[in-house]
Regions:
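Active-site-adjacent beta->alpha loops and helix N-cap segments on the catalytic face
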Residues: 3-7, 27-29, 55-67, 86-92, ...
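Conserved beta-strand positions in the central sheet of alpha/beta enzyme cores
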Residues: 17, 48, 106-107, 184, ...
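Active-site mouth loops of central-metabolism enzymes
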Residues: 15-31, 76-88, 149-167, 243-258
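Active-site beta-loop-alpha junctions enriched in small/polar residues
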Residues: 20-23, 50-54, 79-85, 110-111, ...
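Active-site pocket-lining/capping segments in soluble small-molecule metabolic enzymes
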Residues: 3, 123-144, 151-161, 205-257, ...
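Conserved N-terminal beta1-alpha1 strand-loop-helix module at the mouth
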Residues: 1-49
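Catalytic cores of alpha/beta
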Residues: 85-98, 167-171, 196-199, 219-225, ...
């Protein structure tokens, strides 16, 4: 099922999705397989798999996404970026994605390894909108029409490289006008930021689903590193709570999980079409969050939590 079909079918219940990343080691890959059993037991609608820069974990991205869909029976999506890829290489990757039975892609410009400045690849692309256009031209040429669901990223607090919110929103509209079906936002810790962003996207004429992305805080060190990379702000009250937990990761984790539950509840109450959780390749905290959300009556979630999947083969 393509991305957009989930949100058309899910009007009576929120669409729940997870994001994982491909481990760099064989041991990490083995651990992820175990974690996937637990994540699949929560029955997300789909799982996305991030894309390693410069070939670091690109093959594993496709391997994991194919495993999730073809062996675990859950829809999955590969991330695809412009980093280090020529147009011919993108075509080759798109063919491999298609041949693996995958039909959804998260199209991003991507960040270079090491946090350096982005350099446009030779015969490649600089912007996410160019990548979306390339995907649409590829599928028209290869398959005669739209074949993939395509999601792109949105920034409630503005992309760090944009000159301001107006330019950033114009860039997002360009990605949607070029062919994106879905917008998944960067993480945020104040729901007012998301609601304002959603309002601005609608005013700009963006009609595709705009889905909030939530990342549970699991330690003070983790969130400092991630927010420094993506530009997300930490509200003063949350900062004060985390400052009290600098030497206690368990306490910081409690703060993070409680905040994520509170955010998710409000988002669902306000009628968002779904929530995309950045799960950090762990399952215990996500299970706790899912069990705390008001999903049971609307979506039959009581039959999903911990139920597992008898068809799992890992």
């Amino acid at each position: 099922m393509l991305f957009q079909e989930y949100y058309k079918c899910g009007k009576n219940k929120p669409v729940i999705s997870f994001e994982i990343f491909p481990p760099k080691t064989d041991a990490g890959f083995k651990n992820l397989k175990s974690t996937l059993k637990d994540l699949v037991g929560l029955e997300p609608d789909f799982i996305t798999v991030t894309y390693g820069a410069m070939g670091t974990t690109r093959d594993r991205t496709l391997e994991i996404a194919a495993l999730i869909k073809n062996e675990l029976g859950v829809e999955s999506a590969c991330h695809l970026t412009c980093v280090g890829a020529s147009r011919d290489e993108l075509d080759d990757t798109l063919r491999r994605i298609y041949d693996s039975g995958l039909r959804n892609i998260v199209a991003l410009r991507g960040d270079p390894p090491g946090g350096g400045e982005f350099t446009q690849p030779e015969d490649g692309y600089r912007y996410g909108s160019d990548l979306v256009r390339h995907i649409r031209e590829f599928e028209a040429r290869e398959f005669g029409g739209r074949t993939f669901g395509v999601a792109v990223g949105g920034y409630p607090e503005t992309h760090p490289e944009a000159t301001g919110p107006d330019e950033d929103l114009a860039n997002l509209k360009n990605k949607v006008d070029t062919g994106a079906d879905l917008v998944i936002t960067q993480l945020f810790f104040d729901n007012a930021l998301f609601f304002d962003f959603e309002k601005r996207t609608r005013a700009a004429g963006i009609e595709t689903p705009v889905i909030p992305g939530l990342m549970p805080i699991l330690s003070s060190k983790q969130i400092e590193r991630i927010t420094s990379m993506c530009g997300a702000s930490i509200p003063p009250g949350l900062r004060a709570d985390l400052d009290k937990c600098r030497a206690d990761d368990d306490a910081a984790r409690r703060v993070g999980i409680d905040l994520c539950i509170s955010q998710a509840k409000e988002l669902l109450e306000r009628g968002v079409g779904g929530i995309h959780f950045y799960v950090l390749n762990k399952s215990d905290h996500i299970k706790e969050i899912m069990e705390a959300l008001p999903l049971r009556r609307e979506s039959g979630y009581e039959n999903r939590v911990g139920a597992g999947n008898p068809g799992i083969r890992l």
